[in-house]
């Protein structure tokens, strides 16, 4: 059975619901979890380079705060369930690659993540990190398709 589960999050409500299910699953099989968040790289196109340094620093600060908030939620859920947990925060424009790398580096034997279930052209245009993980992972991937109709809208 699985002993170490990677739980990637993008901070969405669906992802948060998958994290809760992932922690419950980990508890039921005696596994530990690693929470994971990939923050985007800083990209700006401007001719006013004197503004960039402050903007970049603020972007990094905001990204760290967001990651810390998402990862703290995973750690708290795991602690409440009595499940061992550590967290990983990286910066990457290619979250699926970072997810796969973290799973390997941490010795995970399962990746459990949410899917928004976008289909057709919308799914292709928006891209699906879950789909990319599924097609590139050498590890098993458990995809949680929550009922988005039951989730409350983001404010």
Predicted regions and their residues:
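Short, acidic/small-residue loops that bind anionic groups at enzyme active sites
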Residues: 136-145
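Short, well-ordered secondary-structure micro-motifs
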Residues: 18, 45-48, 97-100, 123-125, ...
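Structural beta-alpha unit
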Residues: 76-111, 148-155
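Short, hinge-like loop/turn segments at secondary-structure boundaries
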Residues: 50-54, 103-106, 129-130
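Glycine-rich, Arg-bearing micro-motifs that act as flexible, cationic patches
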Residues: 110-136, 150-153
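Small/aliphatic-rich secondary-structure junction motif
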Residues: 3-54, 77-81, 86
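Acidic, proline/glycine-rich short linear motifs
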Residues: 38-69, 150-155
């Amino acid at each position: 059975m699985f002993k170490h589960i990677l739980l990637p999050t993008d901070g969405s409500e669906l992802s948060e619901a998958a994290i809760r299910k992932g922690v419950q699953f980990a508890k039921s099989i005696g596994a530990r979890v690693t929470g994971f968040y990939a923050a985007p790289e800083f990209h700006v196109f401007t001719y006013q380079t004197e503004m960039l340094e402050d903007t970049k620093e603020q972007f990094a600060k905001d990204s760290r705060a967001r990651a810390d908030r998402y990862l703290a939620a995973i750690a708290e859920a795991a602690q409440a369930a009595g499940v061992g947990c550590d967290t990983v925060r990286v910066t990457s424009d290619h979250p699926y690659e970072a997810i796969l790398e973290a799973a390997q580096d941490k010795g995970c034997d399962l990746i459990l993540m949410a899917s928004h279930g976008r289909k057709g052209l919308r799914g292709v245009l928006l891209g699906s990190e879950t789909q990319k993980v599924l097609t590139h992972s050498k590890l098993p991937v458990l995809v949680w398709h929550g009922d988005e109709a039951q989730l409350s809208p983001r404010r």
